[in-house]
Amino acid sequence: TIYVLTRSESRFENNVNFINWDPDSQRLDLSNIPAVDFIINLAGASIDGSRWTNSYKRKILESRLNSTSLLFKEIKKLKQKPSLYIGASATGFYKKNTKVAQVEKDYKGSDFLSDVVAKWEKESNNFMKYGIRTVLLRIGLVLSKDGGVLKKLYPIFKLFLGVPIGSG
């Protein structure tokens, strides 16, 4: 059985159970779920969606910490813990250096995103306290004409006003 946590109304659709939750108010009830085998947590405010005011920076950080801490709090209550937690993280962890490829053991940067990622990963690592294998995916921005940052740039490219994104 697949369960998807959503801010929308709870419902059952196409063999998927949608469960309402609100990480900001720490509201989630998993008591009716018999077991959770694994969790995939991709929750967090978009980093490409708004001007980075102080209040939006707070939203970027809190949306990640609140969702992760709420999942941890609810998982602690389950008799049978999941065997795997997969959490989104970000390549924004690393120092800004375009001359050398970054590797996992490289040191954290000193900017806002680096701090967000470090706090987010620390929160995610709480799952290990219960013997839950924890995998954190340090991913970059989503590049698809259907979503993410590229969706916003796609109209510019269609008008032949775009420039190469980078070498990869």
Each PLM stretch: what is its role?
Residues N17-L70:
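NAD(P)H-binding glycine-rich loop region in Rossmannoid oxidoreductase-like domains
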Residues L5-S10, D22-P23:
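N-terminal Rossmann-fold cofactor-binding loop
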Residues E62, T98-L136:
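Catalytic helix-loop patch of NAD(P)-dependent Rossmann-fold dehydrogenases
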Residues L5, I39-A43, Y85-T91, L137-I139:
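SDR active-site strand-loop-helix element
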Residues A118, M128, R133-L136, G140-G168:
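NAD(P)-dependent short-chain dehydrogenase/reductase
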Residues T1:
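N-terminal Rossmann NAD(P)H-binding glycine-rich loop of SDR-like oxidoreductase domains
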Residues S69-D111:
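Conserved Rossmann-fold NAD(P)-dependent oxidoreductase catalytic core, especially the SDR/UDP-sugar
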Residues N14, G49-K57, K96-K99, G148, ...:
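Conserved catalytic-core motifs of eukaryotic protein kinase domains, centered on the activation segment
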